[in-house]
Amino acid sequence: MKKDYFNTFEESDFRICEDMEFNSENKNIFIPMEAWFDVDKKFGINIIGDDSAWVNLFAEYNPVIGEIRMFYDIDTENKAFEREYVMTDEERSTITQYIKKMCMQRHHVPCMEFYITEYIETCDCEIDLECRQEGNVCRVYNTNDGAVLYQEDMGGNLSKHIGHKIELANYGDSECYSIECMDCNEVLFSSNAERIGLQDIEDNDGQEMHM
């Protein structure tokens, strides 16, 4: 930790101890972490002298909307409780970048692709997409469960597609998913932008997904 007022986290203060996984209930990526720092000093608790105490640290990250939260569980012989740790902006950035790096190392895909692929493969309802404005952002939702699959600030390209017919498609055996505006024949997002572009879609017989 940095030697500042907040004891600010640094990347060396934690490790992803188990594999990250998609949380279908909360629509985020669940990341178990090891605490390599003084939890008493950082969280203002007092367990250093309790041999029965155990701290479980984890983060929940949604790369589509850019939301990340951190929680810790305290388990002792006499009590157990969970609390959220409210990160500073600097810590939020540090931990987000670390999660992105570890996702690439372990899954060989960006967090966004991991999130969307896992969501699609575990979704237990039909996927009917709608593009609409919410506050100062424009989002593509699954209307059946409220999951956000893509987002841009208002004024960007996505805002031009509000009210249009939006579909989810996949192409070939590459397990590449894309979000498309059928009215404009435009790809709004591809889960693997390096391997697929608009020309690839024109050359391949893409099939719409009805789930």
Where in the sequence are the language-model features?
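Short aromatic-glycine motifs in intrinsically disordered, low-complexity regions
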Residues: 145-153
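Acidic, Ser/Thr-interspersed intrinsically disordered low-complexity regions
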Residues: 203-205
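Non-Sec secretion/translocation targeting segments of pathogen effectors
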Residues: 207-211
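Acidic, low-complexity, intrinsically disordered interaction modules
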Residues: 24-26, 30-115, 122-128, 135, ...
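Amphipathic alpha-helical segments
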Residues: 5-13
